[in-house]
Amino acid sequence: MDPVKNCSFTGNHLGIQPHSFVEIVEMLADDCETITGIRPKTPFNEKGHEILFITPSGDVFADPGIYTFMGYLMLFHELDLDYTFSTYASEGGNFGSFTTFNMAKKLNAKMYAEAERLGAKWILGGECGHMWRVINQYMATYNGPAPSCMMDVPTSPITGTKFTNAAATKMVHITEFTADLIKHNKLNLDPSRNDHIITTFHDSCNPARGMGLLEEPRYVLKAVCNNFVEMPENTIREQTFCCGAGSGLNTEEIMELRMRSGMPRGNALRYVQEKYGVNHMACVCAIDRATLPPLADYWAPGVTVSGVHELVANALVMKGECKRTMDLRQEDLPNVTAEAEEE
């Protein structure tokens, strides 16, 4: 119950105070500058922006989610996106959905309340699982309709695309937004920067079965990675397997149970690792980014886990960036290593 209490009182499940939230994001912006030579802007609680961005707090406080968050910062800076963060609605995940209807409704209400307070026209949401189950299936009846006096049907300021699927909730998933950018050739991408990985994609239960978000993440991954491999068809999309540790089961005390319950996903991952040399698995869920690394270490040692937008930022060629020699984890890029060997 502590995560639920923390979300209610301080805005995120870890109970991190607003000033600490700001400091952590600023630190991640510093890391972006180390890698690219460009320090992305980090607007907090600013009124009058078109977009309010809300993401799971695991992307701010936990490895490997922090690299996904750095990807957001770099993408938004490159687009010069008119957006703001909120330190009060600083948790996209709805931990109330694990407890009671009333608590889930209360936590979800903060999204609209902050959008109204800050004057945002629509909300862009980060990579999360149960966050999007609640938004897609329940938000319109929990706390809708959205404040129609000031919120619009989400429209990309970059491409002009109207996200009519979000007309009721006024919220768009980040992979929908990025897939639209790529479709309209609005990003300068160099997928060779991800040539050190052969990646597959884990369909997180809530976005896949609870939302139908199946094609957009794959469209993005194929644009930013030259080496993408699907796991067997009866283990992905609507037939995906659970990570084995969602719904509050991500604790060290039940690690054996987690490894057993995650075995179907681990088995599918090991299959593509042995057959195709897969060494990376992307996903669009913060809980998965926390639970899948130990599962991969156990069932398919050598496979790393990341969010989709970490790989987007690796491939993103930013205007005015320095010569990129490192990926977001500050590890050498493959093309840089090859150039050094040639010299």
Predicted regions and their residues:
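Iron-sulfur-cluster electron-transfer modules
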Residues: 1-156, 160, 329-343
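Local cysteine-cluster metal-coordination motifs and their immediate loop/turn environment
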Residues: 55-60, 88-98, 102, 106, ...
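Short, flexible loop segments at boundaries between secondary-structure elements
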Residues: 147-191, 233-238, 297-335
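A polyampholytic, Gly/Pro-enriched intrinsically disordered region
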Residues: 104-107, 186-201, 248-261, 323-343
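Iron-sulfur (Fe-S) cluster-binding segments and ferredoxin-like electron-carrier domains
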Residues: 1, 248-262, 290-303
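A short, acidic, amphipathic alpha-helical segment used as a generic capping/interface helix at domain edges
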Residues: 257-279, 290
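Short, aromatic/basic amphipathic alpha-helical patches
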Residues: 138-144, 221, 292-299
